[in-house]
Swiss-Prot record:
Cofactors (names): Fe cation
Metal-binding listed as a keyword: yes
UniProt subunit comment: Homotetramer.
Catalytic activity: 2 superoxide + 2 H(+) = H2O2 + O2
Protein EC: 1.15.1.1
Function comment: Destroys superoxide anion radicals which are normally produced within the cells and which are toxic to biological systems.
Record key words, sorted: Iron, Metal-binding, Oxidoreductase
Protein's name in the database: Superoxide dismutase [Fe]
Gene3D superfamilies: Fe,Mn superoxide dismutase (SOD) domain, Iron/manganese superoxide dismutase, C-terminal domain
PANTHER family: SUPEROXIDE DISMUTASE 2 (PTHR11404), SUPEROXIDE DISMUTASE [MN], MITOCHONDRIAL (PTHR11404:SF6)
Classification lineage: Eukaryota, Sar, Alveolata, Ciliophora, Intramacronucleata
Family: Belongs to the iron/manganese superoxide dismutase family.
Length: 196
């Protein structure tokens, strides 16, 4: 991480982050590495059935790692600019205003759609390189958009482990608070790379 566990307080506690990053995310990394090893062994043995049965574990753990990796970079301590929106003349601001009218409208829609995910999942803001537009996604479990044309700009984790220690069952409250530590500089950097 680019910050200490305590740096995101009071929005996310060090206690929560130590479990979320140190245990949950690490488990995805460990399981992903184990799955790669099993696939390599099955490939060496020419065991197509075993390779096929490992695909769901590969997808789940790779998604868990990638979604979390993006999420951690999407957060920043308030003292380091977390929660500070991009300049009103920035390309990202223009794109968000063109699509949703304002950051407030965007955040309200993002939160409404993401809070409605049944069970665990992720809210995503992505840039579609084909339609040249911003898109919102609500994705279950550790899924990611299926289209290779989608560049991830922002992910918000709504698995219970992302908020339960601090917010209990109040997912909407967590979604409201997390914007106070969104690293908009990182989101904008990804957007600028995507539109090149």
């Amino acid at each position: 991480l680019n910050y200490e566990y305590s740096d995101l307080e009071p929005v996310l506690s060090a206690h929560l982050l130590s479990f979320h990053h140190g245990k949950h995310h690490q488990a995805y990394v460990n399981n992903l590495n184990a799955t790669y090893e099993q696939i390599a062994a099955a490939t060496k043995e020419n065991d197509a059935h075993k390779i096929a049965t490992l695909q769901s574990a590969l997808r789940f753990n790779l998604g868990g790692h990638v979604n979390h990796w993006i999420y951690w970079d999407n957060l920043a301590p308030v003292k380091s600019g977390g929660g500070v929106l991009p300049d009103e003349h920035s390309p990202l601001t223009k794109a968000i205003k063109e699509k949703w009218g304002s950051y407030e409208n965007f955040i309200t829609l993002f939160n409404t759609r993401t809070a409605a995910i049944q069970g665990s999942g992720w809210g995503w803001l992505g840039y579609d390189t084909v339609s040249k537009s911003l898109r919102l996604f609500e994705l279950g479990n550790q899924d990611m958009p299926e289209w290779s044309s989608i560049v991830p700009l922002l992910t918000i984790d709504v698995w219970e482990h992302a908020y339960y220690l601090d917010y209990q069952n109040l997912r909407p409250k967590y979604l409201t608070e997390v914007w106070k530590i969104v690293n908009w500089r990182e989101v904008e950097k990804r957007y600028l790379q995507a539109i090149e």
